[in-house]
């Protein structure tokens, strides 16, 4: 789904955005992933993982439709259809269907059976390993969901009277920060959690289902210790009979650029004040090697920035401050934030501490020693690449693949990744990294304060004044310098 966070953790290695380096060559997909398109347009991708024989078999069916395809009178249709699906046996007998859902749930990593968002609906099953019978039943069930649902007044009423097991992304579509972020976007009027309008017309839900649940708008993913060839044959046999074709393209979800404002938002999502220094840029797909320089340089610069600030706060024995950093792609907007967890009465002081470090890095850059230590750490991670890959379970591999598809990233093989990443690290210099940091830190940034419900609203003008006093004069100078040297004005894509 959209909005997946990427946290910078010691020793982590992001396999998601693998890409080539230097020449602008098209990237070659990892051949370990078998993939194809059926005659009816359904796309499938299968990864056999013999290195993980005990892992569960992960199955995902993504339908490219969500609440954004609904008209006002159709509100709630995209949420109602999977509710109906979950109350039907999907071409199995009732006992088989019950058994499938009981066993198709990973107790260690519980995941909703269906997640509905603005532009997609994701059906998920996690099956015990070595159960080819269950995998066959899962494919039968999902094929039935894809084009053979029984939608009548009786089945609709039965679904609505049953427990709602369908989740939304985001989980709370009415949360204050999320509603703020959607300002200026068509998404605001298309809530995937919206209930059906009364009275319910089953015939209209059926028409919506037939229009948007077409095989040419579906992607099926299977990952696990399986016989990939046999599974591909099962997919062709089970899903090949589905009918229908999209006659109307689905609307493309878009977000407005993040406004460089200072705002306070009351929310149940936090228990302590969280101030986010936030910026965003258009996300650039990674399909060819020229994208590597932009992505990897920007990504490594952000990681270096985070570790620098954290080390400086530790060195100065800073109290009552928690620091976090996350980046995510939201509908092809790449958004990053430095998050400051702080008591209410120390917000201004803690913002000042962080802003001063940001200004120092922007104006003076990282030291040669910091750069050398960072590259050494990245080289160490690279040496452990294959061990890391071997420890990556099927659930993680599946999630990474879903994100790659969502964000238009070509996954390459670990062997190629290792070679290209090594070349990248060998070619990187402290000056290249510092120029990237200057570019990123010279952007206008938003100050977003999330406060627990019931807390007195904080004076954001005071925070903005603190920020401007430290950051703005040099930012303005940097912008003027960039205008004089247009060859360095492009800000690399963030993730």
Swiss-Prot record:
It holds the Pfam family Peptidase_M16. InterPro entries: Metalloenz_LuxS/M16 (IPR011249), Pept_M16_N (IPR011765), Peptidase_M16 (IPR050626), Peptidase_M16_C (IPR007863). Residues 1-24 form the signal peptide. Has lost the active site residues. Belongs to the peptidase M16 family. The keyword ATP-binding does not apply. Transmembrane segments: none annotated. The keyword Protease applies. This is Protein YhjJ. Keywords: Hydrolase, Metalloprotease, Periplasm, Protease, Signal, Zinc. GO terms for biological process: proteolysis. One of its GO terms (cellular component) is periplasmic space. It is found in: Periplasm. It comes from Salmonella typhi.
């Amino acid at each position: 789904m959209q909005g997946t966070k990427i946290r910078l953790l010691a020793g982590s290695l992001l396999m998601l955005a693998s890409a080539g380096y230097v020449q602008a060559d098209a990237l070659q997909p990892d051949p370990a992933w078998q993939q194809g398109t059926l005659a009816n347009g359904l796309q499938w991708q299968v990864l056999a993982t013999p290195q993980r024989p005990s892992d569960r078999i992960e199955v995902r069916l993504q339908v490219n439709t969500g609440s954004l395809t609904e008209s006002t009178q159709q509100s709630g249709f995209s949420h109602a259809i999977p509710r109906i699906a979950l109350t039907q046996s999907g071409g199995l007998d009732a006992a088989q269907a019950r058994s499938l859902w009981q066993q198709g749930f990973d107790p260690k990593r519980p995941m909703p059976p269906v997640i509905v968002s603005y532009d997609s609906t994701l059906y998920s099953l996690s099956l015990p390993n070595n159960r080819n019978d269950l995998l066959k039943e899962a494919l039968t069930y999902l094929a039935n969901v894809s084009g053979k649902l029984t939608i009548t007044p009786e089945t609709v009423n039965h679904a609505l009277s049953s427990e709602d097991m369908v989740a939304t992304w985001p989980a709370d579509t009415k949360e204050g920060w999320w509603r703020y972020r959607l300002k200026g976007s068509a998404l605001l009027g298309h809530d995937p959690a919206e209930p059906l309008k009364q009275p319910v017309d089953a015939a209209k839900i059926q028409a919506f289902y037939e229009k948007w649940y077409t095989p040419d708008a579906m992607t099926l993913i299977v990952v696990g210790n399986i016989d990939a060839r046999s599974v591909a044959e099962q997919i062709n046999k089970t899903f090949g009979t589905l009918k229908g074709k999209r006659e109307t393209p689905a609307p493309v979800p878009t977000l407005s650029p993040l406004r460089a404002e200072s705002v306070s938002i009351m929310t149940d999502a936090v228990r302590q004040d969280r101030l986010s220094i936030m910026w965003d840029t258009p996300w650039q797909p990674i399909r060819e090697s020229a994208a590597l320089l932009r992505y990897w340089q920007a990504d490594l610069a952000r990681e270096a920035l985070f570790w620098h600030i954290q080390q400086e706060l530790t060195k100065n024995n800073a109290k009552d401050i928690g620091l976090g950093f996350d980046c995510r792609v939201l509908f092809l907007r790449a958004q990053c934030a430095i998050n400051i967890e702080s008591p209410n009465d120390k917000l201004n002081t803690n913002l000042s501490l962080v802003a001063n470090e940001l200004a120092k890095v922007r104006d003076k850059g990282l030291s040669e020693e910091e750069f050398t230590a960072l590259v050494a750490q990245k080289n160490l991670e690279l040496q452990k690449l294959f061990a890391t890959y071997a420890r990556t379970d099927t659930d993680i591999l599946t999630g990474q693949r879903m994100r790659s598809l969502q964000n238009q990233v070509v996954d390459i093989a670990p062997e190629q990744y290792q070679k290209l990443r090594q070349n990248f690290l060998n070619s990187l210099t402290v000056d290249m990294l510092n120029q990237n940091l200057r570019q990123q830190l010279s952007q206008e940034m938003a100050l977003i304060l999330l406060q627990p419900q019931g807390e007195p609203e904080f004076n954001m003008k005071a925070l903005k004044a603190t920020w401007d006093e430290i950051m703005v004069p040099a930012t303005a100078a940097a912008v003027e310098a960039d205008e004089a040297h247009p060859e360095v004005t492009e800000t690399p894509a963030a993730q």
